[in-house]
């Protein structure tokens, strides 16, 4: 925590207004030093000159009620969570050795939406994982629709040497992987459009990040709506 605080204060001194917390499994932060992610964000919240903190990606099993509740109350931590889903099939999640199922994921999303109705929620989804039947893929599509995220990051499974998955039965044909990827990308576009439309006519503070070739400035609201 101390090292991260030093870095955050240093970027605040040079005028940074938003800090994005990123890393591999950031929800596991501090375990080796008897610290935790909640303790970190509470400390960061005290730095006066940083206006916004954004949590880049956090596993649903590590996104505790305490973290969600703290973000909901904070004036600095923005209402934006990117939460990996990977699949809406519990069988596939177990095969992927994920530490969560759809019930826990649903619980996390419900908690966020109850406390932060305008929160931007993004999801990672993998298509074409070995054993992903048509039925399993349909479960994923229906689960995503039920959760109503703001956007998806869609990844197409590809074989990697020296992994357990490459030796698994139930390989999904490449053409079917591409079809499923297209379906989810189209769904993501619909979800994003719906989220943006929901935020129309809202008064929000925008942090402008730069300008485009036509001279228009662009930036993002706290809940990650791009504004020009």
Predicted regions and their residues:
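Conserved SAM/AdoMet-binding glycine-rich loop
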Residues: 13-134
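Terminal RNA-binding accessory module
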Residues: 167-228
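Hydrophobic, well-ordered secondary-structure elements that form the walls
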Residues: 83, 124, 144, 152, ...
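C-terminal, non-catalytic macromolecule-binding modules
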Residues: 115, 135, 139-178
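Canonical Radical SAM [4Fe-4S] cluster-binding loop centered on the CxxxCxxC motif
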Residues: 1-2
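Radical SAM enzyme [4Fe-4S]-AdoMet core and its adjacent flexible, acidic
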Residues: 30-49, 96-99, 159-190
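Short, small-residue-rich loop/turn micro-motifs
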Residues: 23-25, 85-89, 156-161, 221-223
């Amino acid at each position: 925590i101390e090292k991260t605080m030093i870095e955050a204060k240093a970027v605040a001194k040079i005028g940074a207004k938003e800090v994005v917390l990123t890393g591999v499994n950031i929800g596991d932060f501090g375990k080796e030093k008897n610290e935790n992610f909640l303790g970190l964000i509470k400390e960061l919240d005290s730095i006066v000159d940083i206006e916004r903190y954004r949590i880049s990606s956090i596993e649903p099993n590590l996104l505790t009620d305490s973290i969600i509740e703290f973000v909901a109350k904070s004036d600095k931590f923005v209402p934006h969570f990117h939460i990996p889903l990977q699949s809406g099939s519990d069988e596939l999640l177990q095969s992927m050795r994920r530490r969560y199922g759809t019930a826990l994921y649903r619980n996390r999303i419900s908690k966020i939406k109850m406390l932060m109705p305008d929160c931007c929620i993004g999801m990672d989804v993998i298509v074409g994982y070995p054993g992903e039947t048509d039925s399993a893929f349909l479960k994923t599509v229906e689960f995503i629709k039920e959760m109503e995220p703001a956007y998806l990051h869609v990844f197409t499974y590809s074989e990697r040497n020296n992994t357990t998955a490459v030796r698994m039965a139930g390989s999904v044909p490449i053409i079917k992987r591409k079809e499923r990827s297209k379906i989810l990308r189209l769904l993501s576009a619909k979800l994003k459009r719906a989220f943006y439309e929901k935020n129309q006519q809202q008064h929000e503070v925008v942090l402008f990040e730069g300008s485009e070739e036509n001279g228009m400035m662009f930036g993002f609201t706290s809940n990650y709506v791009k504004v020009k």
